[in-house]
C-alpha cells in the first residue's frame, strides 16, 4: 500500500553525532570576528554544515587559532587602541594617558584632526609586536620577557600622536592671571 505515509522520519540524528563522526564531510564557514574582552582574545562564529544542511549555525570559536593575521589586526584596533583589554603590560595605560593629553592639546587649539587616527595607532602597535601576538595571554607573555629598553619603545611620545607638530604652550596657557587672581583655563 503506497497511499499512506508510514513514517515521518526514518533515521533521526543529533547534529553533534555528525560533527563528531563525519568531520571529513563537513563544510565550515567562519564569520563575525570581534574582540571579546572577557576572554582576552578575538572570537568568531562557525557555521557547520553537512551537504548544505546546517548542523551548527553559530558555534563560538577562537578566531586567532584559525586566522591569526586577521585576529592580530582586530586585536590591535579593538583591544590596544581602545584600551579594552585587561593586561599587565604597563605601556598601554601610559599610552592612553598620553593620548588623553594629546586630546587636551587638540581641544586647546580647537583643531580637529590634530591627533593621529586610530588606523595609525593600530599600525604603530602592529609594527612593534611579533606576529604571534593576537590575544591578551600572548601579549602578557611576550611583554613580560622584554628587557626594560625594549618595553620603553612601546610607549608613545607626545610628538608621536600630534600630526601638526607640538603646540605653542604660551598661546594656550593652563592658567590666566587677572591682577592677583590666578584662574584655571579649560579648553573645549
Regions found by a protein language model. Give the residues of each.
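C-terminal accessory domains/tails appended to large, multi-domain proteins
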Residues: 1-188
